[in-house]
Amino acid sequence: MSKEHGAAAEKHEFRTEVRKLLHIITHSLYTNREIFLRELVSNASDALDKLRFAQTRGEAAPAADLDLNIAITVNEETRTLTVSDTGIGMTRQELIDNLGTIASSGSERFLKELAEKGEQASNIIGRFGVGFYAVFMVADSVTVTTRSALDASGAWRWTSDGLGSFELEEALDAPERGTRIDIRLKEDAGDFLKKDHLKDVIRRHSNFIPFPVSVEGEHVNTTPALWREPRFQVTEEQYKDFYTFLTFDTQAPMDTIHLSIDAPVQFTSLAFIPNFGNELFGYDRDKYGLDLYVRRVLISKEYKALIPEYLSFLKGVVDTEDLPLNISRETLQENALIAKIRQTLVKQVLAHLAKLAESDAEKYATFWRTHGRVFRMGYNDYINRDKFIPLLRFNSSALDDEKGLCSLDDYIGRAREGQKTVWYVSAPNREAARLNPHVEIFRRKGIEVLYLYEAADEFIMESLGKWNEFEFRSAEHADADALKDFDDVEKKDAPEALDEEGRKTLSSLLSHMKTLLGDKVEDVRESARLSDSPACLASKDGGMTASMEKLMRVMNKDESVPRKVLEINPDHPLTRNLLRLYRADADDRLLAQATEQLYESALLLEGYLRDPHALVGRVNSLLEQATGWYAEVRKL
């Protein structure tokens, strides 16, 4: 670092607020000291931008053949780190104004909070961008040598140890154009003399600066800021390479969302939908967000405030010109611009997914199967409700297999004439849903039922209320009277209808079964919904469904079995056999066993059976009796 200069150096005192700030910075142990390099590179980039703008206006600039670049070099012998640029440079007065006073509101806020809250300085520095002064976290002394591209009055050197004053003098060894910052590093800042460490810092914080940044002659920021490029100029291969750079995932992304927004807020964004969900490989569900850049400089990695949790599968970046570079994380949370970016981003992503669902249903189905568990949680985004609901997907009785998906609008489009209800049933899989006794009446009536496989789906249905004049109801709450206007489309051979005497016996049998079961059930009554099953448990209309009750019991650690209505299918062969048995001997032990078995089988299907041992023992006893009778009849 040369000391050549012209006239004697002028000594200037820092203003009071700067002295306070420098004292805090130089005496604080702050772990994230590398931000000083981000600040210096950002300043250098701004200087290059200003020069380029001046050149486009035709303003004279010395050394016109100089490339626009930023160079970082080290001298291990003198423990000096140098950051230089070929930008617009500074005049004498600009040196005083820019480096002698606090120009950033971030620094002012920093001092104010330190005074008001009395926190440790090391706890606060990281929350505020203190601009150029951050260099004193690592520097014993700093020398800034600069030549303005717009002023022929010469070059100047600014020198300070950060202790309260700075010196200003003419410089005879200044660059042809631009600024050189020589930093004499503290003893504990030796990492910043290592080339690999410097490269890592640049790539993490300043990788997308629009000008070449070199470390010891090696070009470091080689990845272009693709989000700044027009979409039609970016190839799929470039998108894939950038996605890999961002996520380390070698697969191509499932989909790409490239946005350039001018209103109501200006920002650009490049977001990707991965081919795997957050749950895969044990990803931390709480670790999500898009990287926030301000003028290509990284401000916050994986910043959660930019997207709601139901879009947490997105990977990518957001870049805006409208935030100051020195904005802090704390200030970001209170910034109205961030809220506007988030609102706009959510609307754009939902619009993109809507177009995808319409143009490529199979690709959207793949998206749903991969990310639906997280994405479906957007049902509580009431601001975007009308955009979100059409994107929901479910399996259904009208589809061929478990992989099939349909929207609510698809369901409504297939509804029977006069139908104004979307019916659904919760189950762990398609086979369980298909065999659910509550679905039998809908199959008989030719009414489609949505199959819900996720616990959150019932919350979604209950929160929706209505959609396109259709209400949402569980098949468990189906009222046979409400479905009586729909003719049966599935005819089955039924036994001869019970005569008047038979119906009296049935009524008496049901009362007897209620007596046998006692307080275990609310009632035992004839069912109008069952076609194939002998019995089922039913809830009162408006009550919780079985799956919701189970969920609430788990949450409340409640192991009690709720009292339900046991419905009996009067046309089932088992019921007709019980009628014959009841007529012959109401006190027959087999009748009591069969009643208990029907009840516990229904409990088992609904997921309420706590202890299967009694059921298994009873089944074995009944099998023993049945096989004995069978052997006797066959004379074996």
Swiss-Prot record:
Subunit annotation: Homodimer.
GO terms of molecular function: ATP binding; ATP hydrolysis activity; ATP-dependent protein folding chaperone; unfolded protein binding
Disulfide topology: none
Its job: Molecular chaperone. Has ATPase activity.
Assigned GO CC terms: cytoplasm
Organism encoding this protein: Oleidesulfovibrio alaskensis (strain ATCC BAA-1058 / DSM 17464 / G20)
Keyword Chaperone in record: yes
UniProt keyword annotation of Chaperone present: yes
SUPFAM superfamilies, alphabetized: ATPase domain of HSP90 chaperone/DNA topoisomerase II/histidine kinase, HSP90 C-terminal domain, Ribosomal protein S5 domain 2-like
Similarity remark: Belongs to the heat shock protein 90 family.
Keywords: ATP-binding, Chaperone, Cytoplasm, Nucleotide-binding, Stress response
Name recorded for this polypeptide: Chaperone protein HtpG
